[in-house]
């Protein structure tokens, strides 16, 4: 949810506070007794027993671009203070290395709706072979150029492997090994045909296409389901309509292009509500939800008081506390973890760190929590500096 959705105007409303805090939205009850959320999330409210809300995510040091802290689970990856922030591998890249794809011929880590590469953390110290596959380019990337047959492709591959062996004999940096791994995976993806089929959403029945709808986010969610169903192990959808900063960056109507809470955030919420609930329901009906962890989150929260940067209807960045939701993954859902203060501006109970979120994902994916990778100086770096799987849902 690129840009940082407001915690107060989504999953952590403050209906008893003055309007300048509670905002313009009403709240509605949910399937969980005593739990209320924003009025523009009615579908999620009706099936909140399948979700876990986290209202106490510690998002200090997080920023827009690149959003490294939340995507790498390492506070040292703050680009504002660390020029090497880009070298910390993303959670998806770690999963790609330690878990790989669930089926051959499918990229393990895919990014969809990639409006700006700077939004997404990559392989870093793990190497470019663990960068995410740009799913937006799949249609052109997975088809052979005109005049190139599959037999000819196999001949070229054989020749390249002979040349690679000669170069590897004189290579001492390890770069050739990484390149060979990367090219081998690329060849398997192109030659196998499974990826072409997975990325072709038009193969879905009309009823399924209609169920998801025509909005870009909905089609990306459907594509994500197809990829998971066919073997991808980590898929990220950038829920943004803009190439810079992010759609959820609702500073105010006088600060384009995102608008404030009423004109900017309000139109997004019904779309998001439909997308997240349709995806979770579809995964559940197909028997995939218990194996698939679905997470919706931004990079930080927003100010507890309306009227920032000269606006009367927006909220500024607030890298102190944020809310998020998750579903699936054979975890125990139907609960709220943590709490914010009365005005939604700080953590009151059970701080959840980026490391805790990463540890929960790694626990789900079978990645060793005590694992390490090596930096460019040959020093071991822990996959998680500090963090444990969320005990409440395990």
Regions found by a protein language model. Give the residues of each.
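Ligand-binding pockets and gating/stacking loops
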Residues: 1-394
């Amino acid at each position: 949810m690129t840009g940082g959705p407001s915690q107060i105007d989504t999953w952590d409303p403050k209906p008893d506070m003055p309007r300048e805090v509670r905002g313009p939205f009403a709240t509605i009850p949910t399937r969980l007794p005593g739990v209320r959320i924003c009025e523009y999330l009615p579908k999620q409210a009706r099936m909140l027993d399948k979700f876990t809300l986290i209202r106490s995510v510690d998002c200090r040091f997080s920023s827009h671009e690149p959003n490294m802290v939340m995507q790498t689970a390492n506070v040292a990856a703050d680009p504002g203070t660390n020029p090497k922030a880009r070298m910390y591998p993303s959670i998806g890249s770690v999963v790609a290395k330690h878990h790989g794809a669930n089926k051959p011929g499918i990229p393990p880590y895919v990014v969809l709706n990639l409006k700006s590469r700077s939004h997404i953390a990559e392989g870093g110290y793990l190497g470019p072979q663990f960068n995410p596959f740009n799913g937006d380019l799949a249609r052109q990337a997975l088809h052979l150029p005109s005049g190139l047959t599959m037999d000819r492709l196999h001949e070229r591959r054989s020749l390249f492997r002979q040349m690679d062996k000669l170069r590897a004999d004189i290579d001492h940096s390890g770069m050739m090994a990484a390149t060979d791994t990367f090219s081998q995976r690329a060849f398997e993806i192109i030659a196998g045909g499974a990826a072409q089929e997975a990325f072709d959403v038009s193969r879905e029945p009309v009823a399924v296409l209609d169920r998801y709808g025509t909005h870009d986010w909905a089609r990306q969610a459907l594509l994500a389901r197809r990829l998971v169903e066919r073997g991808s192990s980590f898929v990220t959808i950038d829920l943004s309509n803009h190439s810079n900063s992010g759609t959820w960056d609702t500073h105010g109507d006088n600060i384009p292009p995102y608008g404030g809470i009423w004109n900017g955030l309000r139109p997004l919420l019904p779309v998001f509500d439909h997308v997240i609930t349709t995806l979770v329901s579809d995964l559940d009906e197909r028997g995939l939800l218990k194996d698939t962890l679905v997470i919706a989150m931004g990079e930080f929260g927003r100010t507890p008081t309306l009227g920032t940067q000269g606006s009367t209807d927006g909220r500024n960045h607030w890298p102190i506390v944020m809310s998020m939701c998750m579903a699936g993954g054979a975890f125990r859902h139907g609960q709220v973890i943590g709490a914010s203060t009365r005005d939604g501006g700080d953590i009151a109970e059970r701080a959840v760190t980026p490391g805790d979120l990463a540890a929960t994902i790694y626990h789900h994916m079978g990645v060793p929590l005590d694992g390490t990778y090596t930096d460019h100086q040959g020093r071991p770096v822990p996959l998680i500096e500090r963090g444990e799987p969320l005990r409440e849902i395990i």
